[in-house]
């Protein structure tokens, strides 16, 4: 079964956390729980940050974040309430002195990390939240989180597009050891929202099984709350990089019912970056992939074979291979990969049911 992948990841996690300690960030010890929970979808609960008097006005009107901003100050910003900690990897303890410009030290396996993009992301979140928008949604109920505390470290960050527009769910990688949202899903979601789409970045529990359960729950949550969120889940897409690409592919192939939820429609398209996934089920959805030739983790030749096999089964699939790029290049801004997201969005649009 695909989730034997977790066994190897347990070993990798131990090694990685040791390495991060040397770099100045040590492991937090968030535990994975692979038992399924099939109880109901969490209802939308509007999170508000109480503001009163001059102190609150000062907090809301504080200066924009910069590359010199300390990560702990961003996490603790009152405008983010108690979900600020989920903006950065919760599986690493972050040194109090670490600034945004040093963010690469808590993003192992990634390349082309741009602190200025991280600044844009956190300021976008701050401005939206201080303007009264709800930017974070729990996918599990309080009862579910009480029964399984690991579910406290899950949820969806909402990057709003146009009201009633199509929806995308973006899943960051991190080797199923941590969630690299600040580099591998938030930037993608922000760019998709600029195109008018409603984009959600999932924070999930590391571990292949729990990650897929959380993605299945996220899909269920969005379907159940589409009217309140003012989104269109018809022809939604699943995006992901590295481990997140595996999640997107597995949900696309197996569906939500395989991971403890009722059966919901499968995505119109799966968008994958730099993953070594090679297993073909025959149930793949239309798939776009991109990878660099310099990737020492996800072989571009393996990805080419994967996409070719999907096409051989009669399903639309496309791959872009970028010369010289390493693993985890994200948006690839300023590289030969810049613009891949535009191509991926076009692929998604081409495979929407309304366009068939």
Where are the model-predicted features located?
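Conserved alpha/beta-hydrolase "acid-adjacent" motif
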Residues: 296-302
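Short amphipathic alpha-helix adjacent to the substrate-entry channel of hydrolases
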Residues: 181-200
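Catalytic nucleophile-loop/oxyanion-hole region of alpha/beta-hydrolase
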Residues: 180-182, 200-229, 334-337
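Short beta-strand element of the alpha/beta-hydrolase
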Residues: 165-174
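C-terminal catalytic histidine-bearing segment of alpha/beta-hydrolase fold enzymes
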Residues: 53, 59-84, 313-356
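Short beta-strand/loop motif that positions the catalytic acidic residue
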Residues: 289-291, 295
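N-terminal targeting or regulatory segments adjacent to alpha/beta-hydrolase or S9 domains
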Residues: 2-4, 10-16, 22, 27-153
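Primarily recognizes the serine-hydrolase "nucleophile elbow" in alpha/beta-hydrolase
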Residues: 213, 217-284
